[in-house]
Each structure stands twice: as structure tokens, then as C-alpha cells.
């Protein structure tokens, strides 16, 4: 077997092959109306031990993948504003957000227990199944021209809620004791972590209040901020300042024993948009997207594919059960949430179909669980395949749901005077 790792510059050659393969297959996926991450993960599977075995997950590639995780989470946070978080839990929308998360979470956890896995694994399985990928959902709905419809907005609101809750639950899971067998052990081992999360949320609330105070003084603050930004001569200085801002919150999270992505996500959300001059915030997002989607994200998704070992997928019953539970519990959660919110059956069912899009956040959490030793390669492989398959089929089923809504919607009477 030919191994590129034997070359004098293994990182450069490995990176070249990984990036080229990931971008080519990512482009192929885009041509078929799928997120590029699907092609990028498949590229890793082809290059890794599943097929060609020419690339290994070296320490250097893992460092680049970690940077990719950081910037992917920052990108997700930059797409969310505090007001959107309020909208996701405002009024009857809370039913869709809650049941769209809780029912799949319970279904996934019960699946883990049914297969005699420990508490930590079962809860991680439930968490990965419960997530709806915000960027993937936005992309699918935009391609369908349904982003600004009632169904589209409720799916996005639920996805925002899911992303936030999933990271908070992750913070608790990372301190679980694997040897715990009783519920009381889990509660006691998690109490300190929950306290840290509450403290971190308090810091976020204080920061948000300070930013609101600054916003109320915009006539005084804005000119000074703009003068400072114009004073900077270095290229992409504004982008660097944004990264520093987010890193501060990531560092706070790490110092408190939480994972850095929790701080990165909430730091990006709290970033005050109003202090930017017209067009500057868009430039920051474009800079972040360029380095992330053009370089680091493909490397991250490819490393996930490299980590998959298809030969380790010996537990076919678990794979089939995870696929079934992940698909149907999301439908049930969205359906019952929609019904409690006062929506009709077809609209509620379509929301449940739309909540099945998974991707970035679920893959990030699965990767963290693998690194921490909470799950093995076979389970990790099942979670990645589940994310890919549910995401691939979601656009087709969602379009069917929209077609049902259109057929059931009242048509104007063209003969009426």
C-alpha cells in the first residue's frame, strides 16, 4: 500500500491531496443539490482506511481540523442574533423548538440503553440525533425558495434553539463519569458542571447588558470606534479583532472547564453588529467564510471521513436503529410541536421533515466524543453516516411536504365576482 506519510513533507503532501479531493467531491455534491460537507466527508472516507488508506489522521491534520471546528462554530454564531434567539422561544414557537429537541433526544438515549451502552454514550447518541443543523437547513430552504415561508422560519427557529441547547448539554456531558450506573451518580457528577454553565451564562448576560448600554450611546461611541478602525493599517485588521473578541469568550469557557466551542459560539452571537460601519460586518463574514469554507472546513470534514472505518460497522442492527430513530423521532417532534403550536397537520408534518437536516454541529459533537473516548470508531462511524444520510434525503422529503401543503391550501375562486 502506498503511504504519502513516508515523504519528507508529509503534512504538505497530505494537505494537498486532502484539500484537492475534498473540494472536488464537495463540488460534485453541490452539483447534486447537496451540502459540500457530504462530498468532503466522502473524500476522507476514500483516502482513509475505509478504501485507499493513503492518508492518516496525523497530529498536524488534527490541529488544522480543530481550527476548522473553531471557525465553523464562529460562522454559525455570526448567523444568529440575540433577537432571533428570543423569536425561537417566543409564544407557541417554543413547542416546536422543545419537542423537536426533546423527543429525538429521549429516543436516541433510549436506543443507547436498549443496546446496553453506558449513560454517557446513550446521552451523546440522543444529543447527536436531536440536533438540527442550522447552516444546512438554511441552505436547503434557500435552494427551495422556502426560507421566508412560515414553515421555513419555524424550522430555522427550532434549529437555532437546538444549536444552543446542544452546546449547553455538551458542557454537562463532558464531565460525566463513565463508570456511573445510577441516575443519582449522573446528577451529582453533573451538578458542578451545571454550576459552571450557569456562571458562564451569567457572564454572557452581563456582557450583553454592557453591549446594550454601549448601543444606547452610539452617537458617542460609534465615531470613536470608526476612527479607531480607520486608524488600523494592517490588512484584515477588523477580521483579526473579531477573532480576538471570540477567542476571549473561548478562553473564558476553557478556563471554566467548558469546551472552547461553547465560548466561540456565544461570543460570535454577542458580537455587537451595530458598531460596524456599513458593509464592514458583511466583509468580516466574507473573510471568515473564505478561510473556513475554502480551506479549514474541508480539511475538518475530510478528517472525519478519514476517521471512519467501514470495516468497523459490524453492528448493523444499531446502525439501522439509529437511522430509523433519528428520522422518525424528528418527524414526531416537529409534528407534535406544530400541533401544540396550533398548526395544521400537513404544516406540522413538513416541519418535522425539515428538522431532519443534520451536519456541522452534530459532526463536531461526535468528533469531540470520539476524541474524549466516550465513543469508539464504530459508533462514531454510525453517527457520521446517520448525519450524511438524513441530510441527503431531507430535501426530497421536505419538497414532498411542501407539495402536500400547497395541495391542501385553499385556492382562490376565480369565478367569484
Predicted features by range, described:
Residues 15-16, 164, 171-275, 279, ...:
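Core mid-bundle transmembrane helix pairs that form the ion/substrate translocation pathway
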Residues 47-92, 225-322:
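Membrane-interface junctions of multi-pass transporters
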Residues 7-23, 81-114, 119, 182-203, ...:
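Entry/N-cap segments of selected transmembrane alpha helices
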Residues 24-38, 114, 248-263:
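Flexible hinge motifs at transmembrane-helix junctions and intramembrane kinks/re-entrant loops
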Residues 76-80, 103-108, 129-170, 329-337, ...:
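Short helical (or helix-break) motifs at transmembrane helix termini and adjacent helical loops
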Residues 19-32, 75-88, 137-146, 208-219, ...:
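C-terminal ends of transmembrane helices
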Residues 3-17, 58-75, 119-134, 193-202, ...:
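Structural signature of hydrophobic alpha-helical transmembrane segments
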Residues 55, 59, 87-99, 117-129, ...:
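The feature identifies polytopic integral membrane transport proteins across all domains of life
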Amino acid at each position: 500500500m502506498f503511504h504519502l506519510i513516508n515523504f519528507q513533507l508529509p503534512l504538505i503532501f497530505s494537505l494537498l491531496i486532502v484539500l484537492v479531493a475534498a473540494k472536488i467531491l464537495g463540488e460534485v455534491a453541490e452539483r447534486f443539490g447537496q451540502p459540500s460537507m457530504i462530498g468532503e466527508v466522502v473524500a476522507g472516507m476514500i483516502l482513509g482506511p475505509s478504501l485507499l488508506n493513503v492518508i492518516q489522521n496525523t497530529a498536524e491534520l488534527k490541529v488544522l481540523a480543530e481550527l476548522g471546528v473553531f471557525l465553523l462554530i464562529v460562522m454559525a454564531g455570526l448567523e444568529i442574533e440575540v433577537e432571533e434567539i428570543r423569536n425561537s422561544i417566543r409564544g407557541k414557537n417554543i413547542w416546536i423548538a422543545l419537542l423537536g429537541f426533546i423527543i429525538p433526544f429521549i429516543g436516541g438515549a433510549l436506543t443507547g440503553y436498549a443496546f446496553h451502552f453506558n449513560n454517557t454514550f446513550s446521552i451523546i447518541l440522543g444529543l447527536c440525533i436531536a440536533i438540527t443543523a442550522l447552516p444546512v437547513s438554511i441552505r436547503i430552504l434557500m435552494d427551495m425558495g422556502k426560507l421566508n415561508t412560515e414553515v421555513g422560519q419555524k424550522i430555522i427557529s427550532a434549529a437555532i434553539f437546538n444549536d444552543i441547547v446542544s452546546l449547553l448539554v455538551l458542557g454537562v456531558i463532558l464531565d460525566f463519569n463513565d463508570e456511573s450506573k445510577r441516575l443519582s451518580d449522573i446528577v451529582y457528577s453533573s451538578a458542578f458542571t451545571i454550576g459552571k454553565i450557569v456562571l458562564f451564562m451569567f457572564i454572557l448576560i452581563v456582557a450583553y447588558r454592557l453591549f446594550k448600554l454601549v448601543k444606547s450611546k452610539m452617537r458617542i461611541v460609534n465615531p470613536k470606534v470608526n476612527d479607531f478602525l480607520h486608524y488600523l493599517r494592517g490588512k484584515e485588521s477588523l477580521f483579526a479583532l473579531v477573532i480576538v473578541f471570540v477567542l476571549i469568550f473561548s478562553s473564558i469557557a476553557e478556563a471554566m472547564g467548558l469546551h472552547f466551542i461553547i465560548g466561540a459560539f456565544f461570543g460570535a452571537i454577542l458580537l455587537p453588529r451595530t458598531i460596524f460601519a456599513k458593509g464592514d460586518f458583511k466583509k468580516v463574514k466574507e473573510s471568515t467564510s473564505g478561510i473556513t469554507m475554502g480551506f479549514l472546513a474541508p480539511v475538518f470534514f475530510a478528517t472525519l471521513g478519514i476517521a471512519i472505518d467501514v470495516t468497523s460497522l459490524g453492528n448493523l442492527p444499531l446502525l439501522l436503529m439509529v437511522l430509523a430513530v433519528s428520522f422518525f423521532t424528528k418527524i414526531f417532534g416537529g409534528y407534535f410541536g406544530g400541533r401544540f403550536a396550533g398548526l395544521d397537520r400537513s404544516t406540522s408534518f413538513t416541519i418535522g421533515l425539515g428538522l431532519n437536516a443534520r451536519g456541522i454541529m452534530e459532526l463536531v459533537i461526535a468528533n469531540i466524543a470520539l476524541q474524549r473516548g466516550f465513543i469508539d470508531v464504530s459508533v462514531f462511524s454510525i453517527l457520521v453516516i446517520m448525519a450524511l444520510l438524513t441530510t441527503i434525503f431531507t430535501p426530497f422529503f421536505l419538497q414532498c411536504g411542501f407539495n402536500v401543503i400547497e395541495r391542501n391550501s385553499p385556492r382562490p375562486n376565480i369565478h367569484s365576482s
